[in-house]
Structure formats: structure tokens, C-alpha cells
Curated annotation (Swiss-Prot):
Protein name per UniProt: Autophagy-related protein 18
InterPro entries according to UniProt: PROPPIN (IPR048720), WD40/YVTN_repeat-like_dom_sf (IPR015943), WD40_repeat_dom_sf (IPR036322), WD40_rpt (IPR001680)
Location relative to the cell: Preautophagosomal structure membrane; Vacuole membrane; Endosome membrane
Topology of this chain in the membrane: Peripheral membrane protein
Record keywords, A-Z: Autophagy, Endosome, Membrane, Protein transport, Repeat, Transport, Vacuole, WD repeat
Motif (L/FRRG motif): 225-229
Family per similarity comment: Belongs to the WD repeat PROPPIN family.
Function of the protein: The PI(3,5)P2 regulatory complex regulates both the synthesis and turnover of phosphatidylinositol 3,5-bisphosphate (PtdIns(3,5)P2). Necessary for proper vacuole morphology. Plays an important role in osmotically-induced vacuole fragmentation. Required for cytoplasm to vacuole transport (Cvt) vesicle formation, pexophagy and starvation-induced autophagy. Involved in correct atg9 trafficking to the pre-autophagosomal structure. Might also be involved in premeiotic DNA replication.
Length: 427
């Protein structure tokens, strides 16, 4: 039996695990198995809050909605291509294919809309759990220019596909209309997440160094955080239920917890709160925002070009900022170009967690690459829950007043020691 997929439900009270021989559902507080089905090779599973309704992908193109309490199938749908992801709330069911999104009324299972997208092989899509702010977010479809030509390296007869955009389209899933486009990153998107109220959007690009948070639906940038200086694949992002913290896991095997400041944003719409600065496993970076290639302005993205200007404008800004209070820096930022003023932004984690590496049992594979993970915050306690691709469920305590490194308090296994995650964590 191999693990195929793992995800938390919308309020993080349950954990669902899809395997090659059925699926399992666990409560998270306390951790205990709640339900198990031992039939079917389940590629993807999604729950609807704490109800008995689950959505299952049984074969690449076949979706089944089941009632686990009655142990019956409610409906079954077949799609033209592989189903990559499923999203649910109390009003809508979203099915993500590589180049289409199907939107259903979850009460009647009536197809409401079919949305064409740019190729989206990583199923980058988020649906707010909220019924009031029932927003869906996905990469803005790219339109190839009329004069676009296929690169020389492309095989004859193939259609060239441009990289995924760094812009996010906000779609009202009740009114069935696009309402905004958020210019999130210059690089292609890697992951997006909406909070429980549908009022905040977190975004990460494929570089994985900068995490941004925008208000929804108006798209104002509220916060910008730095995960690290070295590129990394972002695996999971999750707000806590009160939207005061954001957890982020990546291929560095460090989970970062970012604190959303209670005070107002700075003059350019970004957070002016500065949590303790930490950069785990990455060289120190004193240049902040402009150091990252993804966010560079002109040639300022190059570390060497910044060092050349040390002692001039860049050096003066760095030395001055060490002696200037946050309020003064915010006022000065209003007179500087955006790329320069954003160097004062905090962009560091408030707390962090280092994931342990477990010893694989018989048939385990230590060479399976980075330890992938899905993260969530407990609704009742200051704890971070992490499920890893080697089948472990961890609970860490964090200090909400001081931050710092989290402490491992509980550890469980969601599968046998020989099982590993072979398909994907929820992206």
C-alpha cells in the first residue's frame, strides 16, 4: 500500500489520507482514526468540513462523491482529461484539470461554469471555505501574442506553452464572474492559498523566497515576508483560523510561521511590523527585497550589482536604516521608488520548525528527495500540525509571544512504516 495524497479539511479538525488501497480519515485533536475504506486506488481525496461527504478521484478522469456515514455513492462524474485537484466548500465544488476548471453547485451537482485556463499542471487553485466570500483564485490565463512563434527546440507539430503567469485571477464563485487580477509575482506562481474568511490571499512564486499576502477582493498588498535567500519549492501554505499567522513548508524541510501584524500597513501597503529576523540554512542578506531576482527592479536584483553600489546609495540606505525608527523609515519610504522603499520591509519568520527525518522501515526510501509536507494550525491551541511524505504526523508547540523555534510535542504515523507518499501533497 502506497500513500497517494494527504490533506486537512477546511477547519483543520480532520486529516484525510488517500492510498493505493482505499483511504483513511483521522481527527487531529485528539489524533485518532475516524474512518477507513480499504478498496480502490485513490489518487486525491477532499473533505467537506466535518461532514460525511468526501470527494474521491478513483481513476485519472473519474470523480466520485461518497457519503461515509451511509457508505454510499452520491454521484460519479467523468472528465475529458486527468483530474488534478478538487476543492470544496458548502456552496461549490471545483474540479481542476490541466487546462480547465469545472464549477458545480454542491447541493444539486449542477454544472455552473467551465473555465478555460492556461496549462496548469500543478493545479494551482484555491477556493475560500467561506460561503459568504465564496472566492476562487487561480493563475491569470495567458494569451499568446499573434506573432508568437514556437521555439526552435520544440518538436515539429507541437504547440508551445508559455510559463504560468505570476498574476492571480480572483473569481466570484457565486456570481460566476471574474472580479480582479492581482499582480503577485514576476516569476510564475508556485502556490496560492485563501484564508477561512475568503479575505486574504497568500502567494508564492516558483523561486520560493518571497511570500506575499493580499486583501481579497480588492487586491491590496498587505504583507510581504522572506522565507529565505535561496530558491526553494513551496509545498504548503496555510492560515490559522483567525488569520493572524501563516504557515509555510518547503523543500528546505523547515516550516516557517509568519505573524500578520495587528498594526496598520506601511505607506506602500505593506506590513511595517518587523518580527525577529532568521534565515535558516541560507546566507545572511542585508539588502532585503531588492536582492531577490524575482522582485528585482532593473539590474538591482543581482547581488554583485548591489555590492558595487555599497558606499553609495545602497550603502547609505543600509547604514541609515539601522539608526532610523520604523515610523521615520515608513515616512521616507513614501518618497522613494517602490523597489527601494521595500528594502525596509521585514520579510522574516516569527517562528520556525525543523522537521525531523525518520528512519524508513523495510522498503522505505531515503533517496526519495526532499521531505514533502502539508501544514496547518490548530484551531484551539498554539500548535502547528505537519504531515510529511514519510507518513508521519507531527504536532509542534510555538510561543505566540516570543516566537523562535517550535517544540515537538507529539508524533504519530498515518500509515505503516513501509508506506511513503508517492503522488503529491496538497499544493
Amino acid at each position: 500500500m502506497a500513500m497517494n495524497f494527504v490533506t486537512f479539511n477546511q477547519d483543520y479538525s480532520y486529516l484525510a489520507v488517500a492510498t493505493s488501497k482505499g483511504f483513511q480519515i483521522f481527527t487531529t485533536e485528539p489524533f485518532a482514526k475516524s474512518y477507513e475504506a480499504k478498496e480502490g486506488n485513490i489518487a486525491v481525496i477532499e473533505m467537506l468540513f466535518s461532514t460525511s461527504l468526501v470527494a474521491l478521484i478513483l481513476s485519472p478522469r473519474r470523480l466520485q462523491i461518497q457519503n461515509t456515514k451511509r457508505q454510499c455513492t452520491i454521484c460519479e462524474l467523468t472528465f475529458p482529461t486527468t483530474v488534478l485537484a478538487v476543492k470544496l466548500n458548502r456552496k461549490r465544488l471545483v474540479i481542476v484539470l490541466e487546462d480547465q476548471i469545472y464549477l458545480y453547485d454542491i447541493q444539486t451537482m449542477k454544472l455552473l461554469s467551465t473555465i478555460d485556463t492556461s496549462p496548469n499542471p500543478n493545479a494551482i487553485c484555491a477556493l475560500a471555505p467561506s460561503s459568504e466570500n465564496c472566492y476562487m483564485a487561480y493563475p491569470l490565463p495567458q494569451k499568446a501574442p499573434a506573432a508568437a512563434s514556437t521555439p526552435a527546440h520544440a518538436p515539429p507539430g507541437t504547440t508551445h506553452v508559455s510559463p504560468t503567469t505570476g498574476d492571480v485571477l480572483i473569481f466570484d464563485a457565486v456570481k460566476l464572474e471574474a472580479i480582479n487580477v492581482i499582480e503577485a509575482h514576476r516569476s510564475p506562481l508556485a502556490l496560492i492559498a485563501l484564508n477561512s474568511d475568503g479575505t486574504l490571499l497568500a502567494t508564492a512564486s516558483d523561486k520560493g523566497t518571497i511570500i506575499r499576502i493580499f486583501s481579497v477582493p480588492d487586491g491590496h498588498k498587505l504583507y510581504q515576508f522572506r522565507r529565505g535567500s535561496m530558491p526553494s519549492r513551496i509545498y504548503s501554505m496555510s492560515f490559522n483560523t483567525t488569520s493572524t499567522l501563516l504557515c509555510v513548508s518547503s523543500s528546505t524541510e523547515t516550516v516557517h510561521i509568519f505573524k500578520l501584524a495587528q498594526q496598520g500597513p506601511s505607506s506602500d501597503g505593506s506590513s511595517s511590523h518587523s518580527p525577529p529576523s532568521r534565515d535558516h540554512g541560507s546566507p545572511p542578506n542585508t539588502y532585503g527585497y531588492a536582492h531577490e531576482e524575482d522582485e528585482a527592479v532593473g539590474d538591482a536584483g543581482s547581488d554583485s550589482s548591489l555590492r558595487k553600489h555599497n558606499g553609495t546609495l545602497m550603502g547609505m540606505i543600509r547604514r541609515t536604516s539601522q539608526n532610523v525608527g520604523g515610523a521615520v523609515a515608513a515616512r521616507m519610504g513614501g518618497y522613494l521608488p517602490k523597489g527601494v522603499s521595500e528594502m525596509w520591509e521585514p520579510a522574516r519568520d516569527f517562528a520556525w520548525i525543523k522537521l525531523p527525518r525518520s528512519n524508513p522501515g523495510p522498503g522505505g526510501n531515503t533517496g526519495a528527495g526532499p521531505l514533502r509536507s502539508v501544514v496547518a494550525m490548530s484551531s484551539n491551541t498554539p500548535q502547528v500540525m505537519v504531515v510529511t511524505s514519510d507518513g508521519n504526523f507531527y504536532v509542534f508547540n510555538i510561543d505566540l509571544s516570543k516566537g523562535g523555534e517550535g517544540t515537538l510535542t507529539k508524533q504519530y504515523s498515518v500509515v505503516d512504516s513501509t508506506d511513503r507518499l508517492g503522488y503529491t501533497t496538497e499544493y
